[in-house]
């Protein structure tokens, strides 16, 4: 069978992250805003008739049973009873473990793409439900919209954000999400916030002080980036970002990036490139269908 290529898995940044408390099951109650970016990883798929799932590229060092792309495909098989398999190739363009949602976005793209290619016919809501079983960030990528999020991050409300460009910097270290959320000194009692507070800039990242105190590279990157625009950490790190009104401003700052770090410029978008692809395929199917 032929390859189906150029399936995007876009990045996100957390415009803020408030921790409201901890649930009895140990998960934290959060408020955040997921800003989808126009940059990310890319996947390709080839349907297999034998039911096997084979992945290569990007994260070859990760065992298949720990890889979200394979786990997402297997979950879709098990849920629908589909007997088809797939070859999956991941072109990894985002830094691993940087707080950009790369693994979650990869899983969401697998669910959406194989749902189409296998003809399993699940709705977006059903796919988002499967995604939540894989990780709290997966549903926002399944829906493909910049959103306000609550709960563990799964209760989503699409929001409009200003048209901005972002300089995203990876300071060369990896921060463990589990370590951050288990930390004794982490703020866990923030008052609930509002979308109007976000728009007024009265928000923060509750994980940032602890990470800055324990990861010198993140602290240095935030200090450097703050020289150009208000900087903040995304998620639990290690990536940090700053917003700019114009692309040229962001690229001028990127040109001065210290050699030890990596960075890129991306635009914030309301709808993801994955959602755009799915809509384009549906429009094509509608045009080609019977009249």
Swiss-Prot record:
**Residues involved in ATP binding:** 95-105
Fetch the Gene3D superfamilies from UniProt.
Answer: 3.30.230.10, GHMP kinase, C-terminal domain (3.30.70.890)
Q: Does the keyword Acetylation apply?
A: no
Q: What is its EC number?
A: 2.7.1.148
| SUPFAM superfamilies the UniProt entry points to | GHMP Kinase, C-terminal domain, Ribosomal protein S5 domain 2-like
Q: Which GO terms describe its biological process?
A: isopentenyl diphosphate biosynthetic process, methylerythritol 4-phosphate pathway; terpenoid biosynthetic process
Keyword annotations of the record: ATP-binding, Isoprene biosynthesis, Kinase, Nucleotide-binding, Transferase
Gene Ontology MF term list: 4-(cytidine 5'-diphospho)-2-C-methyl-D-erythritol kinase activity; ATP binding
The lineage's top-level taxon is: Bacteria
Reactions catalysed according to its record: 4-CDP-2-C-methyl-D-erythritol + ATP = 4-CDP-2-C-methyl-D-erythritol 2-phosphate + ADP + H(+)
- Keyword ATP-binding attached: yes
Disulfide bond annotation, renumbered to this chain: none
Q: Where is the active site?
A: 12, 137
- Pathway membership of this protein? Isoprenoid biosynthesis; isopentenyl diphosphate biosynthesis via DXP pathway; isopentenyl diphosphate from 1-deoxy-D-xylulose 5-phosphate: step 3/6
Task: Write out the function statement from the record.
Answer: Catalyzes the phosphorylation of the position 2 hydroxy group of 4-diphosphocytidyl-2C-methyl-D-erythritol.
Q: Per its UniProt record, what HAMAP family does this chain match? A: IspE
To which protein family does this belong?
Belongs to the GHMP kinase family. IspE subfamily.
Protein name, as recorded? 4-diphosphocytidyl-2-C-methyl-D-erythritol kinase
């Amino acid at each position: 069978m032929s390859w189906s290529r150029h399936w995007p898995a876009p990045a996100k940044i957390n415009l803020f992250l408030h921790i409201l408390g901890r649930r009895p099951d140990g998960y934290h109650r959060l408020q955040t805003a997921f800003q989808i970016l126009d940059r990310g990883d890319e996947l390709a798929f080839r349907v297999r008739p034998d039911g096997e799932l084979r992945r290569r590229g990007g994260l070859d060092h990760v065992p298949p049973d720990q890889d979200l792309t394979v786990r997402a495909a297997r979950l879709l098989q098990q849920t629908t009873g589909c007997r088809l398999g797939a070859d999956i190739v991941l072109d990894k363009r985002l830094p691993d473990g940087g707080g950009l949602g790369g693994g979650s976005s990869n899983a969401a793209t697998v669910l959406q793409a194989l749902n189409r290619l296998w003809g399993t016919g699940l709705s977006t809501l059903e796919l988002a439900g499967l995604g939540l079983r894989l990780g709290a960030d997966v549903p926002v990528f399944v829906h493909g919209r910049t959103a306000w999020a609550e709960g563990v991050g799964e209760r989503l409300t699409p929001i409009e954000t200003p048209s901005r460009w972002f300089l995203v910097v990876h300071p060369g270290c990896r921060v463990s999400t589990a370590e951050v959320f288990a930390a004794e000194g982490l703020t866990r009692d923030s008052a609930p916030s509002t979308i109007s507070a976000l728009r007024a800039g009265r928000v923060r990242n509750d994980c940032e002080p602890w990470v800055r105190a324990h990861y010198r590279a993140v602290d240095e990157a935030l200090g450097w980036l703050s020289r150009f625009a208000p900087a903040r950490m995304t998620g639990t790190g290690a990536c940090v970002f700053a917003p700019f009104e114009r692309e040229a401003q962001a690229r001028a700052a990127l040109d001065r990036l210290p050699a030890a770090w990596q960075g890129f410029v991306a635009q914030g978008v309301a709808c993801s490139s994955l959602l755009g692809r799915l809509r384009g395929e549906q429009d094509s199917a509608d045009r080609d269908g019977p009249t």
